[in-house]
């Protein structure tokens, strides 16, 4: 199976609805049937609004453009909001999916996006300007994207932490 993974120079498009779309991978997959092999394509994409909203989609079809379109539509439907603070995260998070683990840390202004492959695409469409991310374990693009999104879903704002602990935000921030 050959996977075409697009990292730093992935094709990014901005739609008329203000969403940024990025293709992460396109796989050619085959199903073996009595008459031979049936080829199809599986596309993985992320969509973000540049202000903390992010979604991931996976589409399969007989032709590449159709699979890409399906992936983009699914990504738009499954978008969720991540709270950002000055273009970075509030705290360090760890995300897991399958054999992939990602460690995502906030970074100071001017650091930039220090992340590899699929994670970089996620942060760029999401609007994160400063972050340090490390992938551990499997480097499968699908698992990395899911692990990154699981970590981002687990991130909390200081107000949410304070509400859970029954304290004020000032007590949490020290």
Curated annotation (Swiss-Prot):
PROSITE patterns: RIBOSOMAL_S5, S5_DSRBD
Physiological role: With S4 and S12 plays an important role in translational accuracy. Located at the back of the 30S subunit body where it stabilizes the conformation of the head with respect to the body.
Domain of life: Bacteria
Keywords: Ribonucleoprotein, Ribosomal protein, RNA-binding, rRNA-binding
Protein name listed in UniProt: Small ribosomal subunit protein uS5
HAMAP family: Ribosomal_uS5_B
Domain-level remarks: The N-terminal domain interacts with the head of the 30S subunit; the C-terminal domain interacts with the body and contacts protein S4. The interaction surface between S4 and S5 is involved in control of translational fidelity.
One of the protein's GO biological processes: translation
One Pfam match: Ribosomal_S5_C
Keyword rRNA-binding among record annotations: yes
Keyword RNA-binding carried by entry: yes
UniProt similarity note: Belongs to the universal ribosomal protein uS5 family.
Stored NCBIfam families: rpsE_bact
Organism for this UniProt entry: Bordetella pertussis (strain Tohama I / ATCC BAA-589 / NCTC 13251)
Record's subunit section: Part of the 30S ribosomal subunit. Contacts proteins S4 and S8.
Cellular-component GO terms for this entry: small ribosomal subunit
Residue ranges of coiled coil: none
